[in-house]
Amino acid sequence: MNKQEIFNGLWTITKEKHKACKADAASVDKSHPTERGALQLKSGIYNVAIAAGLISGTDQAIELMSKRFKNLIKHFPDIANYYYTLHEDQKELMEIALYPEVFMRVNFYNTYNTDLEQAEKDGNPQIIFKAKIKKEVLDDILNMWREFRIQNELFTFAFDGKEEK
């Protein structure tokens, strides 16, 4: 796979998930506001994954992903060490294949886990409900992107079940 094919694959599966979730939310009767709101929240998080994790698919998305990746991997020393041993062409593939996951983990993973822990401490059922949805959707996004990488044999060692901080 080349960079564009990797990007297109990640973009397509994320966009499909977003559209399905958005359609599900629209199909729920307004007399069920909790279910509808939960689905709208899920749809919004998938949209964040598209807008931020995949840089909205802009023409410069691949270039920006490559540029930003170098700073973000500092949070994951094992991945960074491996990255710096690669030839340039392999580095470019790794940048695109891992950028969305690295971005979401750095910017949202700890926040969503901390939000859930705090909500559970506070005991507010509505906040717990929202925090669980956020964490569930983020986990789904990360798993979806990881599955894509595994199916395409792209840096399958990264985030292989061991939490990296």
What are these regions, as identified by a protein language model?
Residues 50-94, 103-104, 108:
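Long, low-complexity or tandemly repetitive, helically biased scaffold regions used
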Residues 15, 19-22, 26, 71, ...:
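Basic, mixed-charge low-complexity alpha-helical segments
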Residues 22-37, 54-59, 84, 88, ...:
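Charged, low-complexity interaction regions
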Residues 33, 37-51, 57, 94, ...:
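Alpha-helical oligomerization interfaces
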